[in-house]
A protein has these predicted regions:
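N-terminal leader/signal peptides at the extreme start of proteins
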Residues: 1-24
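Sequence-pattern detector for short linear motifs
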Residues: 8, 16, 50-52, 56, ...
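Short, well-structured segments within or immediately adjacent to enzyme catalytic domains
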Residues: 57-58, 62-302
Length: 302
């Protein structure tokens, strides 16, 4: 009897090929992780960008201080006025010469006169044309250059807003007994043209100056705009008003992580809270004073 051999093949079944790539669930997990990481990184990047702008702004202010000191050295130890006299305004309406124009020959880098922290909304109302870039009248051209965002401590350094026969005020550098504690130039947001409903810097109001928290009385120009020879007889702030009128004051701007960038008369730059600059406590309480503005670092003097 024949036997038949049957050949058996114990072969493994072919493996089912796994599709390449990620599954939908894996993709969703990866996307979620990326979203979490982005959410963690973006605020840090935003803070880093703000810090870089603040550092650039402090550098600008140091260079402006150099230009200002060179001007003072070249003008018998006297500071420039915040603006040219009203009597010097031309019939053609050419922009008046401002403090930035006065010191420009000594610091001819236009970029340092414009704050890197101005927002897109702020820039149109916070910028002033350099007078030397506007030829014969008020028409601005492609050659017109601008400065903006920085204000001058005009009530204690140089104020030409003196009507009624009162002489313009120009401080002597040697009269400032506390140069390391006297504001020279800093971030400003301008004034509100006397109307609380207006934006700061409305219609270019006070966008190139800074007012102290209290109007000057016995020191400096003895007021923003004096109406007589009596000390303090006149306005407290750039747009008029009396002490404490925020709508009239050309106010410091806390553009740098909640701080005001500024440079002092001795040339060093700092970032201060508005409250500290105005002599208030960190919570904003207490009576303001002009110690960091008046040249003598004395809170009792104005």
């Amino acid at each position: 009897m024949k036997t038949h051999r049957t050949d058996f093949c114990f072969c493994s079944r072919p493996a089912v090929a796994r599709p390449s790539g990620f599954t939908l669930i894996e993709l969703l997990v990866v996307i979620a992780i990326i979203g979490i990481l982005a959410g963690m990184l973006l605020p840090a990047l935003s803070r880093a960008k703000a810090t870089a702008k603040s550092i650039a702004s402090l550098s600008n202010l140091r260079q402006l201080a150099i230009g200002l000191q060179l001007y003072v050295d070249d003008h018998a130890d006297r500071y420039p006025g915040h603006s040219s006299l009203a009597s010097e305004t031309t019939a053609l309406g050419k922009p008046r010469t401002r403090w930035a124009d006065y010191i420009y020959p000594y610091m001819q880098n236009e970029a340092v006169y414009l704050s890197p922290n101005l927002t897109r909304d702020e820039r149109p109302r916070m910028s002033k044309a350099f007078a030397h870039t506007v030829a014969d009248g008020p028409v601005e051209t492609a050659q017109t250059r601008y400065f903006g965002g920085y204000g001058y401590n005009y009530q204690y350094l140089g104020n030409n807003r003196q009507p009624g026969g009162v002489a313009p005020f120009h401080a002597r550098s040697s009269s400032l007994r506390a140069p390391a504690q006297t504001l020279s130039i800093g971030d400003t947001k301008g004034a509100r043209l006397g109307n609380p409903a207006n934006d700061y810097g409305h219609d270019g109001s006070g966008v190139y100056v800074l007012d102290p928290p209290l109007g000057s009385v016995m020191l400096g120009s003895q007021g923003s705009r004096r109406s007589s020879a009596e000390p303090g007889d006149g306005n407290a702030y750039y747009e008029g008003g009396s002490d404490g009128s925020d709508a009239h004051r050309s106010t410091p701007a806390a553009r740098n992580n909640g701080r005001v960038n500024l440079v002092l008369v001795d040339g060093h730059a700092e970032s201060l809270k508005v409250e500290a600059l105005d002599g208030r406590s960190s919570g904003g309480s207490g009576q303001p004073h002009n110690a960091l503005w008046n040249g003598v670092f004395d809170p009792a003097q104005r």
